[in-house]
């Protein structure tokens, strides 16, 4: 790939930052040489009921994986996100809700949020929810979703959120695995102008004979649409909260008490419930939010993620509110009712920090200047990217077009399992290279290992990305299956947390995530990350999106199969076919030239925007008899279209 352009730290950011480069280097050094001392000091970023005296008790040893932080301290998450701000900023806005329809919006101040959360906490208690019980949320993006999360944390219940786009089968599987006692949902959700039948899906999920633990379903009225009602089970949110007190003292929780379970979609098999606990998670969420986004008091923060994903948990709800920020909760999608919706929301609410995903950026980029029509986005100070590696071309477009070349981009790498951001630039400290997640956050010790598990000491290197020691936000276990936790994350490379990603490190020590290790191709003995070839393809001016998979090849071992979506107004031709192959040859080298170009209008994506490569691999190899679970796809019809197109390829 061509050498990346370097963007130095902006002077205006450096002048008011929490950490310039010297501060970052000093803090990072302390965090890895003296983690006890570092986290003993920075653990105080949250309020403790009983202060901790133990800081870090962690082991990655085979058969003894055990992760505990701040173990003897006690605290309450909702008190940290709400109560501690009331004296100073009770009348400040906590949550701005922007509806799917641009005419719908409302705000909640910290005082109002306190009242709502206390009321709903008491309502949950009335429905029989006790400390330690699991509550399942299957909610639209309305303020009540955040209220329900915070109410669970207030009374010591464990929430498990299932994204509102998941099917009844997927919902039932998560309810069964988590032993949830109550479901909180809405009559319907609204997204992109369409109603989502949430209550209907819950009703269907609860007909599964293996669902045995649910006693109540609390229903928030979002649309007033027609729904079935089960008299002894279903309860309206507004009725449940009308007759209870608006005072609810926060439950004193131990640092290692479970806070939430969040299921990651394993491509096959039983859902994997990632368990996060109270103290370490909140410290890490609060700390990363403050430093990564260089948050300054009074700023407005917009994370476009759904609360059903880890990004929504950590950087829409807990991180911003623990810091006393204004956080935007957006019900819609970035391109509805028009392509410039995201930019319009930025202007309307004077957003200072925008955190979104490469898939949204690329979708807008394909529409060119339509994405910013009639807006100036002058309020933006910091922009972020999350969810997958961002290719340099999309990075540059985001920086120049959305950000007017004045907002640094924090390209953040992390996972559901990590609780918070692990590798990232800091706005006032890090010179930026488009496409690189740059350097580790405080306390995070990344390393590259070869396939035998040997740490690669060279500065410039490529290998499997591992983390050598624990950090406070790390998941503690797979719910109900600690053996699976050890097996999945600690057995491949002994004594290390294996991320499942490959990465390269450049001569400046910057990390470049190359994609999942199972997305590594081996062509004639050459290892190549699919992300690198995809980046080269997307850099072509006519290409909107690309996905690469490997298919078996008699001579090369693997051949390169490229799915390519063109920009609006472009059409596949024989000339373009040759041009694209020549382009990749020029960008990376002959070894990376795609063997097959499969033109298509759309790629199969989950509702969080991730491309389902597992399905693409099967279609490319002609193995379409068992495509596995397609219930998490945003548009399942894409699959049949791809299979038909594949049949027509010579």
UniProtKB/Swiss-Prot annotation:
The modification N6-acetyllysine is found at residue 610. GO terms for molecular function: acetate-CoA ligase activity; AMP binding; ATP binding; metal ion binding. CoA binds at residues 191-194, 311, 335, 524, 585. Mg(2+) binds at residues 538, 540, 543. Acetylated. Deacetylation by the SIR2-homolog deacetylase activates the enzyme. Keywords: Acetylation, ATP-binding, Ligase, Magnesium, Metal-binding, Nucleotide-binding. Its cofactor is Mg(2+). GO terms for biological process: acetyl-CoA biosynthetic process from acetate. GO terms for cellular component: cytosol. It catalyses: acetate + ATP + CoA = acetyl-CoA + AMP + diphosphate. ATP binds at residues 387-389, 411-416, 501, 516, 527. Its EC number is 6.2.1.1. Catalyzes the conversion of acetate into acetyl-CoA (AcCoA), an essential intermediate at the junction of anabolic and catabolic pathways. AcsA undergoes a two-step reaction. In the first half reaction, AcsA combines acetate with ATP to form acetyl-adenylate (AcAMP) intermediate. In the second half reaction, it can then transfer the acetyl group from AcAMP to the sulfhydryl group of CoA, forming the product AcCoA. Belongs to the ATP-dependent AMP-binding enzyme family. This is Acetyl-coenzyme A synthetase.
């Amino acid at each position: 790939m061509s050498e990346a352009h370097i963007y130095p730290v902006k002077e205006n950011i450096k002048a008011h930052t929490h950490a310039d480069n010297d501060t970052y280097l000093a803090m990072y050094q302390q965090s890895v040489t003296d983690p006890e001392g570092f986290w003993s000091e920075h653990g105080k970023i949250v309020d403790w009921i009983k202060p901790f005296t133990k800081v870090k008790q962690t082991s990655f040893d085979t058969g003894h994986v055990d992760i505990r932080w701040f173990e003897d301290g006690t605290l309450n998450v909702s008190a940290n996100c709400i109560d501690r701000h009331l004296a100073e900023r009770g009348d400040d806005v906590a949550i701005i809700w922007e509806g799917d329809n641009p005419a719908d919006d409302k705000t909640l101040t910290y005082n109002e949020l306190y009242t709502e959360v206390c009321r709903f906490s008491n309502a949950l208690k009335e429905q029989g929810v006790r400390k330690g019980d699991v509550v399942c949320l299957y909610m639209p993006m309305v303020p009540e979703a955040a209220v329900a999360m915070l109410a669970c944390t207030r009374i010591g219940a464990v929430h498990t959120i299932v994204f509102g786009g998941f099917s009844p089968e997927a919902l039932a599987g998560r309810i069964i695995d988590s032993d949830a006692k109550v479901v909180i949902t809405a009559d319907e959700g609204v997204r992109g102008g369409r109603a989502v039948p949430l209550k209907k899906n819950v009703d269907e999920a609860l007909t599964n004979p293996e669902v045995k633990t649910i006693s109540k379903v609390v229903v928030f009225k979002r649309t007033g649409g027609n729904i079935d009602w089960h008299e002894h089970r279903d309860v309206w949110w507004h009725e449940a909260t009308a007759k209870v007190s608006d005072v609810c003292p926060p439950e004193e929780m131990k640092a290692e008490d479970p806070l939430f379970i969040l299921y990651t979609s394993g491509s096959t098999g039983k859902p994997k419930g990632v368990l996060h606990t109270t103290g370490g998670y909140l410290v890490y969420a609060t700390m990363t939010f403050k430093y990564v986004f260089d948050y300054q008091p009074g700023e407005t923060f917009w994370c476009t993620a759904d609360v059903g994903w880890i990004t929504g948990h950590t950087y829409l709800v807990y991180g911003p509110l623990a810091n006393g920020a204004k956080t935007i909760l957006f019900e819609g999608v970035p391109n509805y009712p028009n392509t410039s919706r995201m930019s319009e929301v930025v202007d309307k609410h004077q957003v200072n920090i925008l955190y979104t995903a490469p898939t949204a950026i690329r979708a807008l980029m394909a529409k060119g200047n339509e994405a910013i029509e009639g807006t100036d986005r002058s309020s933006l100070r910091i922009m972020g990217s999350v969810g997958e590696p961002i290719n340099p071309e999309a990075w540059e477009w985001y920086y120049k077009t959305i950000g007017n070349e004045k907002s640094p981009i924090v390209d953040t790498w992390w996972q559901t399992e990590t609780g918070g951001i692990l590798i990232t630039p800091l706005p006032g400290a890090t010179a930026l290279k488009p496409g690189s997640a740059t350097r580790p956050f405080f306390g995070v010790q990344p390393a590259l290992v070869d396939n035998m598990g040997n740490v690669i000491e060279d500065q410039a290197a490529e290998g499997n990305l591992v983390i050598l020691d624990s950090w406070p936000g790390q998941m503690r276990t797979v719910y109900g299956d600690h053996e699976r936790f050890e097996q999945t994350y600690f057995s491949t490379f002994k004594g290390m947390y294996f991320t499942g990603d490959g990465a390269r490190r450049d001569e400046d020590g910057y990390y470049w995530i190359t994609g999942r290790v199972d997305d590594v191709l081996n062509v004639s003995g050459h290892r190549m990350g699919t992300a690198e070839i995809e980046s080269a393809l997307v850099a072509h001016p006519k290409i909107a999106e690309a996905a690469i998979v490997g298919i078996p090849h008699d001579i090369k071992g693997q051949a390169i199969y490229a799915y390519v979506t063109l920009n609006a107004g472009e059409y596949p031709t024989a000339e373009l076919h040759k041009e694209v192959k020549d382009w990749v040859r020029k960008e990376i080298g002959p070894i990376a030239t795609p063997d097959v170009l499969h033109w298509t209008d759309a790629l199969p994506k989950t509702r969080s925007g991730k491309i389902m490569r597992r399905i693409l691999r099967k279609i490319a190899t002609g193995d379409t008899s068992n495509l596995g679970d397609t219930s998490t796809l945003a548009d399942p019809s894409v699959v049949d279209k791809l299979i038909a197109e594949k049949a027509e390829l010579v």
